[in-house]
Amino acid sequence: MNTNDFDFELPEELIAQTPLEKRDSSKLLIIDHRQKTMVDSHFDHIIDQLNPGDALVMNNTRVLPARLYGEKPDTHGHVELLLLKNTQGDQWEVLAKPAKRLKVGSQVNFGDGRLKATIIDELEHGGRIVEFSYDGIFLEVLESLGEMPLPPYIHEKLEDAERYQTVYAKENGSAAAPTAGLHFTTDLLKKIEAKGVHLVYLTLHVGLGTFRPVSVDNLDEHDMHSEFYSLSEEAAQTLRDVKQAGGRVVAVGTTSIRTLETIGSKFQGDIQADSGWTNIFIKPGYQFKVVDAFSTNFHLPKSTLVMLVSAFAGRDFVLEAYRHAVDEKYRFFSFGDAMFVN
């Protein structure tokens, strides 16, 4: 298939720049790909789409304040680093600007030298491996000096950094939020659990590759980014029990889908505790092994995330649903509205 097969018209004013005041007040488009139906609803009604005995699977990763602004001590030139992933110890892969000035051995200071970074390797596309030095605990230093790395299509400053975290965010490590989870409130999750739905958590640390456009025409030539995932034995056992009892595995967001399907592909459809790196690319033709339904936000044209949704619900029907969402003025992307896919 061709990348352009997943293009659609999106007016720029539909790209949500700020979160709604109430997390669960966003709109929800409920689609059923077998019945070919679409229903306009609101997110707090997602509980009506869940049955007792189902499992609702959420990604509990927490976004790091991963954008750092500093300067080179020799030239006082301004430098921006965006932390991508922890490679080992105090070494991180980062995206650097301006990268051309940062050669191996270069040093960057942040916060009057409270945090120092030394370039130890150069990667392509402005990537660098840096080693940090600091006093105290790294995450605490980062919390005081770093800024939340909002996606490139959001131009307004975020008033409350916690609005770019899910209410169940726990495991530090992401460069972007698993945005399908931003709609849930603690109260809504309590109601869902009281209905007899199992709440299950996994971890996938979202990398910036999630925003990287597909740069090839032929999907088979696309090089998918890798992200770290983890599923505990307790979570795996709950999911096995749910499947055995005839319940559904309902994933919250594409990151949960990619984790579950990575594990399902690795263990021939079985659900086992596992951790590692995944670069799974789910596109039309893929046979789903674990996920029975899911919620997700509205994604960028020609993105791998639209391709993933199309793999589950069919390209033509998904693009029809997206056209409906545009006509009905749904809000798109990270702070936008949601879709529930049966």
UniProtKB/Swiss-Prot annotation:
Keywords: Cytoplasm, Queuosine biosynthesis, S-adenosyl-L-methionine, Transferase. Its EC number is 2.4.99.17. Pfam families: Queuosine_synth. It catalyses: 7-aminomethyl-7-carbaguanosine(34) in tRNA + S-adenosyl-L-methionine = epoxyqueuosine(34) in tRNA + adenine + L-methionine + 2 H(+). It is an enzyme of class 2 (transferase). One of its GO terms (cellular component) is cytoplasm. Pathway: tRNA modification; tRNA-queuosine biosynthesis. The keyword Translocase does not apply. The keyword Transferase applies. It comes from the Bacteria. InterPro entries: QueA, QueA_dom1, QueA_dom2, QueA_sf. GO terms for molecular function: S-adenosylmethionine:tRNA ribosyltransferase-isomerase activity. It is found in: Cytoplasm. GO terms for biological process: queuosine biosynthetic process; tRNA wobble guanine modification. Belongs to the QueA family. NCBIfam families: PRK00147.1 (NF001140), queA (TIGR00113). Monomer. Transfers and isomerizes the ribose moiety from AdoMet to the 7-aminomethyl group of 7-deazaguanine (preQ1-tRNA) to give epoxyqueuosine (oQ-tRNA). This is S-adenosylmethionine:tRNA ribosyltransferase-isomerase. It comes from Streptococcus pyogenes serotype M18 (strain MGAS8232). The gene is queA.
